[in-house]
Amino acid sequence: NGQKKYVMNYKNSLKHGLYTEWSIDGRLTKDIEYDMGRPISEYIVEYEGQGYIELNRRNGELSGSWIEWYANGRKSEEGVYKYGKKGGLWTAWYENGEKKYHSKYIDGKPDGIYTEYDSKGRLTANIEYDLGNILTEYHITRDEGGSTEYHKKNGVLDGRWTRWYANGNKAEEGLYEEGKRSGTWNGWYRSNKKHYKSLYADGKRAGTYSEWNSKGKKTKEIDYSNGNRIREYLLIKDGSGYM
């Protein structure tokens, strides 16, 4: 079609200097600097569907900026490679322009705080890394019924766990220790009235579990020991009753 394909310089029959290449529709695809046949530095554009990736190499290894673009012209991901490995700050975005995540890398390993967002710009995760090893995690998940916030340590639930209704009121809250429920857990109705209160030790119910109806009247008490029911007390219309 008459479109230029490439321009190359030679010295003593060897590639030397700048080599430039274009696609059939005239888009730049390569700028490669040669030294007597050996590629020193490379700038490459790889077209994938309607988007594309810009990357750099030095002495055959990824080195320098790396940028991925959406078809709409917005950035998808950007960062830097050092000696073939991710280094420094990396950031990604959704196609609508909202930030997706940002993270720091050292020698190809995530280090420090990794932060993630959903496509509406709301925080979904904060994860602390130490050279690729996860130290602590904070997550918030959302669905039609509401949202859940929780923490992890060493890969298991550890710390406060909270469930929220879609109207913003709390549904349930308590603590995890090393993957097991611990201490006092409380639950609420959507109206914000108390639903239950329960105690846990090593993931098992302990002490007195109390329950209320949606009008705020206590309806039940159950005593537990090591997860086993010891006594159950139901409140009936006249205010008393055992079972």
Regions found by a protein language model. Name each.
Residues 1-243:
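Glycine/tyrosine- and acidic-biased, solvent-exposed loop/turn segments at the edges of beta-strands
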